[in-house]
C-alpha cells in the first residue's frame, strides 16, 4: 500500500493517547484533524467533553525513578509530553505518587489542543476508518459500536476484552474526621492520605458485607474477565478473607498517630486494616476510596462502604462503575511503532493496543504520534530501545505470546536486563536500570 499524499494526519479520539499523539504530530509542524465524538455523542463513563478525561482514578501512580511508571513519566517529560506537562501543572498532594485535579488537568489539555494553530478539532462521531490520510486511532476502551465493528473487521475478528471499574468519590465535608488520620505510607513525601483504620472485628464484618452484597449484572453472554490492576474490590474480597489486607487495605506503614483516640485493637500500634482516601481535586473537597473499584449496585455501595470508620454518613458524589474494555491482538497486528502490519498508514494507540494505565496509554500515543509524523515526512521509524520504559512497553505488547496476551502495565520485568553481574539490592538495581534508560533516551532525543 502506498503512502498517503494528504497534507494532514487524522487522529481519532481525544483521550490521553489521542491527545498526546495529536500534540506530538502538531509540534513537528504537521496539520492535524483531531476527531472527538463527545459533545455530539456521550459515552457511558465520561462525565465531560474535555480531552484526556480521567474516568477511573485521578492518580498517575508512583513518581520515583525506582518505580517503573515513575521512570516512564520522566522519559515522557523529556519527550515533551503534553499529558505530563499539564498533569504537573494540576498536581494535588498524594505522598510519593503523582495525582492531579482531574477537572483542571483535563481543561488545560483541552485548551492547549483547541488553541493550537495546527490542530483542527472536529466534534463528530467517526463510523468508518478514514483512508484519505495517515490516521492514528485512539478511541480507547469505550469506542463507539459503529467504529468498533470496523476496527474488528480490520483486525480479522472480535479481539479481546476485559472489565475494569472506577472507585467511588465522596464529599470530604461528610467524613467524620475524628475517626480518620492524615498520613502517607511509611511517611513518604507529605502526609497526603486520609486513613480509615479498622479493628479486626470491623474488618470481618466489612468483609462479610462486601462478599455478600449484590452486584450489578453483566451481559449474560460475557464472562467476567478483569485486569488485575483494576479489579473490583468485591472480586478481590471473594478470593480470600485476607486478600484485601495485602492489597488496598494493607495496614503496613500506616501506624496510628500518637494523638489518635478512636477505636483500636488493644495496644497495637498498627490497625488491623486501613482504607485510604486520596484527594481528588485541587480544592480538596473530594476524595476517592483508593483501590475500591467496584461493580456493586449503587444502593449496596452506600450500605457497605458506610461501614468504613469515618464514612458512616459519607455523601457519595459518584458511585463506582464498571465498563468493558476491548483490546487488540497486538502481537499479530501491530509493529513496535503501533503501526498496523497490514496498512502502514494506520496507527493505533491507547488501551485498545493492550497497554494498561493512564501513563502507559499516553506513552503509546506519544510513540504513535512521533512515528506517524516521521512516516508523513518519509523519515525512518523511531523505535525506542528496550532498555527504556517507553521502548520496552510497545515491544512487549507487540511481541507477547498472542494466545495468552493480556493488557500490561509498565514494569521493570519487561525492561531489558542490565549487563554484567546481577545487582542484588533491588533499589540499587532499579536505580541502575533507570540511569541507563535515561542515558539511552537522551541518545534518541538527538534524532528528534
Curated annotation (Swiss-Prot):
Compartments where located: Cytoplasm
Stated role: Catalyzes the folate-dependent formation of 5-methyl-uridine at position 54 (M-5-U54) in all tRNAs.
Entry's Gene Ontology molecular function annotations: flavin adenine dinucleotide binding; tRNA (uracil(54)-C5)-methyltransferase activity, 5,10-methylenetetrahydrofolate-dependent
Gene3D superfamilies the record matches: FAD/NAD(P)-binding domain
Family, per entry: Belongs to the MnmG family. TrmFO subfamily.
GO cellular component, one term: cytosol
Reaction equation(s) it catalyzes: uridine(54) in tRNA + (6R)-5,10-methylene-5,6,7,8-tetrahydrofolate + NADH + H(+) = 5-methyluridine(54) in tRNA + (6S)-5,6,7,8-tetrahydrofolate + NAD(+); uridine(54) in tRNA + (6R)-5,10-methylene-5,6,7,8-tetrahydrofolate + NADPH + H(+) = 5-methyluridine(54) in tRNA + (6S)-5,6,7,8-tetrahydrofolate + NADP(+)
Known cofactor(s): FAD
Protein name: Methylenetetrahydrofolate--tRNA-(uracil-5-)-methyltransferase TrmFO
GO biological process: tRNA methylation; tRNA wobble uridine modification
Keywords: Cytoplasm, FAD, Flavoprotein, Methyltransferase, NAD, NADP, Transferase, tRNA processing
EC number assigned by the record: 2.1.1.74
Binding site for FAD: 13-18
HAMAP family: TrmFO
Top enzyme category: transferase
Native organism: Streptococcus pyogenes serotype M18 (strain MGAS8232)
Superkingdom of source: Bacteria
Amino acid at each position: 500500500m502506498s503512502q498517503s499524499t494528504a497534507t494532514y494526519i487524522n487522529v481519532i479520539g481525544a483521550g490521553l493517547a489521542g491527545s498526546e499523539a495529536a500534540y506530538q504530530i502538531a509540534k513537528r509542524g504537521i496539520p492535524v484533524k483531531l476527531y472527538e465524538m463527545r459533545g455530539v455523542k456521550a459515552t457511558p463513563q465520561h462525565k465531560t467533553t474535555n480531552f484526556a478525561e480521567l474516568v477511573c482514578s485521578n492518580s498517575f501512580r508512583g513518581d520515583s525513578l525506582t518505580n517503573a511508571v515513575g521512570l516512564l513519566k520522566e522519559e515522557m517529560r523529556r519527550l515533551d509530553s503534553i499529558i505530563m506537562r499539564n498533569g504537573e501543572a494540576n498536581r494535588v498532594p498524594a505522598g510519593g505518587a503523582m495525582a492531579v485535579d482531574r477537572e483542571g488537568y483535563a481543561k488545560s489539555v483541552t485548551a492547549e489542543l483547541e488553541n493550537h494553530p495546527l490542530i483542527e478539532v472536529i466534534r463528530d462521531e467517526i463510523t468508518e476508518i478514514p483512508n484519505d490520510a495517515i490516521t492514528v486511532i485512539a478511541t480507547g476502551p469505550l469506542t463507539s459500536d459503529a467504529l468498533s465493528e470496523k476496527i474488528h473487521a480490520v483486525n480479522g475478528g472480535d479481539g479481546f476484552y476485559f472489565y475494569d471499574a472506577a472507585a467511588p468519590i465522596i464529599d470530604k465535608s461528610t467524613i467524620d474526621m475524628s475517626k480518620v488520620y492524615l498520613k502517607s505510607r511509611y511517611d513518604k513525601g507529605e502526609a497526603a492520605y486520609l486513613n480509615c483504620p479498622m479493628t479486626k472485628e470491623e474488618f470481618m464484618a466489612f468483609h462479610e458485607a462486601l462478599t455478600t452484597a449484590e452486584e450489578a449484572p453483566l451481559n449474560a453472554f460475557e464472562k467476567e474477565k478483569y485486569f488485575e490492576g483494576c479489579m473490583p474490590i468485591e472480586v478481590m474480597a471473594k478470593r480470600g478473607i485476607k486478600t484485601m489486607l495485602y492489597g488496598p487495605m494493607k495496614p503496613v506503614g500506616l501506624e496510628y498517630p500518637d494523638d489518635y483516640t478512636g477505636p483500636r485493637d488493644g495496644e497495637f500500634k498498627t490497625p488491623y486494616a486501613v482504607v485510604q482516601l486520596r484527594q481528588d481535586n485541587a480544592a480538596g473537597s473530594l476524595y476517592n476510596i483508593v483501590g475500591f473499584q467496584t461493580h456493586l449496585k449503587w444502593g449496596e455501595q452506600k450500605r457497605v462502604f458506610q461501614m468504613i470508620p469515618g464514612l458512616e454518613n459519607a455523601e457519595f458524589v459518584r458511585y463506582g462503575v464498571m465498563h468493558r474494555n476491548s483490546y487488540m491482538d497486538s502481537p499479530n497486528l501491530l509493529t513496535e511503532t503501533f503501526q498496523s502490519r497490514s496498512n502502514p498508514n494506520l496507527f493505533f494507540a491507547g488501551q485498545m493496543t493492550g497497554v494498561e494505565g493512564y501513563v502507559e496509554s499516553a506513552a503509546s500515543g506519544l510513540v504513535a504520534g512521533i512515528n506517524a509524523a516521521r512516516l508523513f515526512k518519509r523519515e525512518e521509524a523511531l523505535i525506542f530501545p528496550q532498555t527504556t520504559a517507553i521502548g520496552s512497553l510497545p515491544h512487549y505488547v507487540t511481541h507477547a505470546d498472542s494466545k495468552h496476551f493480556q493488557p500490561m502495565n509498565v514494569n521493570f520485568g519487561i525492561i531489558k536486563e542490565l549487563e554484567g553481574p546481577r545487582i542484588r539490592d533491588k533499589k540499587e538495581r532499579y536505580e541502575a536500570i533507570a540511569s541507563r534508560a535515561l542515558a539511552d533516551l537522551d541518545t534518541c532525543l538527538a534524532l528528534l
